[in-house]
């Protein structure tokens, strides 16, 4: 059924199709037409949390937490929403989302378009979802990079009571200078500030909410080693590898190869796996890794687990394969 739907959706503007698909999914969910499936197919522990299975939804699909219940019916072991910022912002000008079907890729330069953390919290409070929910946090575009920690701290404080875990997004290529936060001193200062705030919030709320950090695929081994050292030193709870790539050389002479933004899907597969493997080598099992990037079929998820990931996340693969990808991944991981 999805291949037919995809042909129709791919005839639409990519961003319009994105919203149409989510609205349609929500309608089908409200009508009770999504079959109830047991997602407890391969329980795993991640950052102290019990997941029913290790296949999660990556951040970016549901930026405001408007579709949590419907997405929760698709069999995921966990769902991550966002990226969310302290204040609402429109993101970058349209068009800002492009499909590259010849390469099973997607280019986006969305720019953290979202309705703000307060709206997201209200959406979560209305949700009936009782599974593992991650909230991915970022900084507003107007916030100077030297004040970025302030934005992350605001989001952390507001999200804390409503999240199963929180992801610190410092790797989107679509917010100016954001990736500079992945470097040594800047990374240490930011993560230490967040870990200190986490300790305070754990005391206030009487519960511990794990903190993960999401990194880019465009890192050399020295940078990966540096990041591994920092996350171990500050005792982060997890790390997500990886975000989208700014390297579009894999697209060759394709007309969209010159578009600004991050490239995801099949073209990021090898880069993401390279970072995952190097990261796993340098982490030494001190904290779990969530593998994301280029999972287009079930066996791709199994590859990431073999390379050192504890769990995986999908997004672009869903656009090309539909919800069947989740079952395909679970089947591959069960072998």
From Swiss-Prot:
It is found in: Cell membrane. Pathway: Pyrimidine metabolism; UMP biosynthesis via de novo pathway; orotate from (S)-dihydroorotate (quinone route): step 1/1. It holds the Pfam family DHO_dh. Its main location: membrane. It comes from the Bacteria. InterPro entries: Aldolase_TIM, DHO_dehydrogenase, Dihydroorotate_DH_1_2, Dihydroorotate_DH_2, Dihydroorotate_DH_cat, Dihydroorotate_DH_CS. FMN binds at residues 59-63, 83, 136, 169, 214, 242, 265, 294, 315-316. Substrate binds at residues 63, 108-112, 169, 174, 243-244. Its EC number is 1.3.5.2. It is a peripheral membrane protein. The active site is at 172 (nucleophile). GO terms for molecular function: dihydroorotate dehydrogenase (quinone) activity; dihydroorotate dehydrogenase activity. Keywords: Cell membrane, Flavoprotein, FMN, Membrane, Oxidoreductase, Pyrimidine biosynthesis. Binds 1 FMN per subunit. CDD domains: DHOD_2_like (cd04738). It catalyses: (S)-dihydroorotate + a quinone = orotate + a quinol. One of its GO terms (biological process) is pyrimidine ribonucleotide biosynthetic process. Its cofactor is FMN. It is an enzyme of class 1 (oxidoreductase). GO terms for cellular component: cytoplasm; plasma membrane. Catalyzes the conversion of dihydroorotate to orotate with quinone as electron acceptor. Monomer. PANTHER family: DIHYDROOROTATE DEHYDROGENASE (QUINONE), MITOCHONDRIAL, DIHYDROOROTATE DEHYDROGENASE (QUINONE), MITOCHONDRIAL-RELATED. NCBIfam families: PRK05286.1-1, PRK05286.1-2, PRK05286.1-4, PRK05286.2-5, pyrD_sub2. Belongs to the dihydroorotate dehydrogenase family. Type 2 subfamily. This is Dihydroorotate dehydrogenase (quinone).
């Amino acid at each position: 059924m999805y291949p037919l739907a995809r042909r129709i959706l791919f005839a639409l503007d990519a961003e319009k199709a994105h919203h149409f698909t989510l609205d349609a999914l929500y309608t089908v969910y409200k009508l009770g037409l999504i079959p109830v499936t047991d997602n407890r197919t391969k329980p795993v522990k991640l950052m102290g949390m019990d997941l029913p299975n290790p296949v999660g939804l990556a951040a970016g699909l549901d930026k405001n937490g408007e579709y949590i219940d419907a997405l929760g019916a698709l069999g995921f072991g966990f769902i991550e929403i966002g990226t969310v910022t302290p204040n609402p912002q429109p993101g970058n000008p349209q068009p800002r989302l492009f499909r590259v079907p010849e390469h099973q890729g997607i280019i986006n330069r969305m720019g953290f378009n979202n309705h703000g953390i307060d709206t997201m919290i209200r959406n979560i409070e209305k949700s009936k979802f009782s599974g593992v929910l991650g909230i991915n946090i970022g900084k507003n575009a107007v916030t100077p990079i030297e004040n970025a920690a302030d934005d992350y701290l605001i989001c952390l404080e507001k999200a804390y009571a409503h999240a199963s875990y929180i992801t610190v997004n410092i790797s989107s290529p679509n917010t100016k200078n954001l990736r500079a936060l992945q470097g040594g001193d800047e990374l240490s200062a930011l993560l230490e500030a967040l870990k200190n705030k986490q300790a305070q919030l754990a005391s206030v709320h009487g519960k511990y909410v794990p903190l993960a950090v999401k990194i880019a695929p465009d890192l050399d081994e020295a940078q990966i080693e540096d990041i591994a050292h920092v996350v171990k030193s500050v005792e982060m709870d997890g790390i997500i590898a990886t975000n989208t790539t700014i390297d579009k050389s894999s697209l060759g002479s394709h007309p969209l190869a010159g578009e600004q933004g991050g490239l995801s899907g099949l073209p990021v597969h090898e880069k993401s796996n390279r970072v995952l493997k190097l990261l796993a080598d340098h982490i030494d099992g001190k904290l779990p890794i969530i593998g994301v990037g280029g999972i287009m079929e079930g066996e791709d998820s199994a590859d990431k687990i073999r390379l050192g990931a504890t769990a995986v996340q999908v997004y672009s693969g869903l656009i090309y394969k539909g919800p069947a990808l989740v079952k395909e991944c679970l089947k591959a991981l069960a072998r």
